[in-house]
Each structure stands twice: as C-alpha cells, then as structure tokens.
From Swiss-Prot:
Gene3D superfamilies: FAD/NAD(P)-binding domain. Its EC number is 1.18.1.2. This is Ferredoxin--NADP reductase. The lineage of its organism: Bacteria, Pseudomonadati, Pseudomonadota, Alphaproteobacteria, Rickettsiales. It comes from Wolbachia pipientis subsp. Culex pipiens (strain wPip). Homodimer. It catalyses: 2 reduced [2Fe-2S]-[ferredoxin] + NADP(+) + H(+) = 2 oxidized [2Fe-2S]-[ferredoxin] + NADPH. Keywords: FAD, Flavoprotein, NADP, Oxidoreductase.
Length: 334
C-alpha cells in the first residue's frame, strides 16, 4: 500500500488531519491501536461535554468524533485500527515504510504523529478482587450516561474527571458518593461550587477524607464499597451499584521511544512553525508534541494539523501551496 501521509493516531486531531490533508489533495492512511476511531474521546469520555469548539456551545466527545469522521469522509482516508506502529523505516531514500504489529506495511512520503498522550490505561486502585468487577460494576470511564439511571454510584478521586462526572451523572443517578483523600478538590472553582450545591440538595455526598478500602459483592455485581477514614481509620460501608475510580491514566510512549525522534519529558520536540520533529518528514501535533509556551488545547491541535499539512505539501511538491479558502475550493473526493 502507498499513500502520501501516514497519520499515527485516530483521535480528534488525527481525524481532522485526514480532512486537512485531503483539502490539499494528499491521500492519508490512519493507524490507531484502539479498535475504533476517536482516541480518548471515544474510549474514555464519549458522553463528556466539550465547551470550547467554535460554533458549538456544547458538544459531546462522541458527537465531535462523528462530525470529524463525516468531515473527513469525502477524502476516503484508510483506517487501520487495532494496530500499533512498530517501526518507521526510510531505507528507500526519502519515502518511509510504516510497519505495524500485525505486519501491515504502508509506504508514504511523510508521517504525522497525532498520538495524544501515547498509549494509556487507567490507574487501577489496589483493591482485592477488583478484576472480578471490572466492566460489570466497576468502570474507569463512562460510555453511556443512561446506564447509570436511578443507580447509586461511588465515584473515587479528587481531580477534574471525578468532579466533572459527578456533576454530569447527578442528573440521572439516584445518589452519588464522592470519595477523596482530602477535603480540597483539584477542579475549577465553578465545578467545586456545583459540587457544594449538589451536596446541599442531597444529590451527592462528599465522603472526605476517606480512601477506598474493600469491595463487597459477588459474580461481578457490586453490593457495597467499604471506605476508610484517613485520620481515624474508621471504616464505613456504602451500598452501591457502581464504582467509578478516576485516578488518572498511566501513559506510555511505547514504540515511539525507538523511532529516533528527539523527546523531552515524554513529549516529542517539534519546530513550532512547522511541527517538524528531529527527523525529516516526520511531524508531531496535538498533546504528543511540545515546544515553548505550547497550549494543550484541542483548538491548538487543529491549528497544528493545518500547519503540518501545509509544510508537508511544500516539502513533497518542492513548492508552496496555491492557497485557496475552503469556500472557494469546495470539497472534492479523491
């Protein structure tokens, strides 16, 4: 298989890059280790609202991915899902051969790494027998809010994810207990005010300073969560249908470490003007890329996508783009 650009990562920035490249008449293949496009937006936060997309006062992560996929579809990008890029070889001059873990090979003229935070998995709390309950009554993400309708939920964690999901799920849940080691939550003041309001209304209870201690139930169905007070060591049993631990994600760059690209603190160093890495014709955009004063916003990732694509076009064709606004150019299928 041959193409112009291989995009590594099928999150929102990677999908938009397929569209942006298509607008410049460049063909793309997109490779992602997950079994569906969307990255963390689909895998972890599908029903979480996003508020900073221009033109959308609010849009769920899943809906954003669907819209981006539709936007890119006229250019017919080829998706290789459930595959991990193992090797980037350019033994044949300027062109690359991309090789995945299942032996897929794609020849291309340039590579764009849009791998977000790299390979990730949720941090699992050290509770005996927790594996029995996972994906049955213990979940590390929320795929369908309706699954929690009229249920009693224990949410563990004190960061943005725990606080945000408490606010969202309080709209459908019977009761939510929020377990945190400290009285202070690491969330925005606005969200903290919402938590206090929900507690005053009896929709949630902030169980602090406590930590998870034990699970009670059987056959994968949770009956209760036992928590322990940090100071007094007093134990408390909370009847619950679900446990949602939000203790962050463990990130791993995986094979990226072996691609001969200059890294800094787990991120790929790029030229902020072009998004080019330390290897010619290999670019990095979105959260995986770093440069001075970078803003880790989805909007910035979209802009980086355009900058990288325009520079790739110039390199491939040895001439600058004949710039046209999308209103003039329109959309033409490959």
């Amino acid at each position: 298989m041959e193409t112009d650009i291989v995009i590594i990562g099928a999150g929102p920035i990677g999908i938009f890059t397929a569209f942006q490249a298509g607008m410049l008449d460049m063909r793309c293949h997109v490779i992602d280790v997950l079994d569906q496009a969307g990255g963390q937006c689909t895998a972890l936060y599908s029903e979480k609202p996003i508020y900073d997309i221009p033109g959308y006062p609010v849009i769920t992560a899943q809906k954003l991915i669907e819209q981006l996929m539709e936007q890119a579809s006229p250019f017919e990008p080829v998706y290789h899902l459930s595959q991990k890029v193992e090797k980037i070889s350019n033994n044949e001059g300027e062109n690359f051969t991309i090789i995945t873990n299942i032996g897929t090979e794609v020849k291309c003229k340039a590579v764009i790494i849009a791998a977000g935070n790299g390979m990730f998995e949720p941090n699992r709390p050290p509770l005996s027998g927790i594996l029995e309950y996972e994906n049955k009554s213990v979940f590390y993400s929320v795929n369908k809010i309706s699954d929690f309708q009229d249920k009693t939920i224990v949410i563990a964690g004190g960061g943005d994810s725990a606080a945000d999901w408490t606010v969202e799920l309080s709209k459908v849940a019977k009761k939510i207990y929020v377990i945190h080691r400290r009285k202070e939550f690491r969330c925005t003041p606005e969200t903290r005010n919402k938590l206090e309001s929900l507690e005053n209304d009896g929709k949630i209870e902030l169980v602090v300073p406590y930590q998870l201690h034990e699970l009670a139930g059987g056959n994968g169905q949770l009956r209760a969560v036992i928590v322990k007070n940090i100071a007094s060591k007093e134990e408390r049993e909370i009847s619950a249908d679900f446990l949602l631990p939000f203790f962050g994600l463990s990130m791993n760059l995986g094979p990226i470490n072996n691609w001969g690209i200059e890294l800094e603190h787990g991120r790929i160093i790029v030229d902020p003007a072009t998004l080019r890495t330390s290897r010619d014709r290999i670019y990095a955009i979105g959260d995986i890329a770093t440069y001075p004063d970078k803003l880790k916003l989805i909007l910035n990732g979209f802009a980086e996508s355009a900058m990288a694509c325009y520079h790739i076009y110039k390199v491939i064709h040895n001439s600058p783009v004949n710039f046209q606004y999308s209103t003039s150019k329109g959309i033409h299928r490959n």
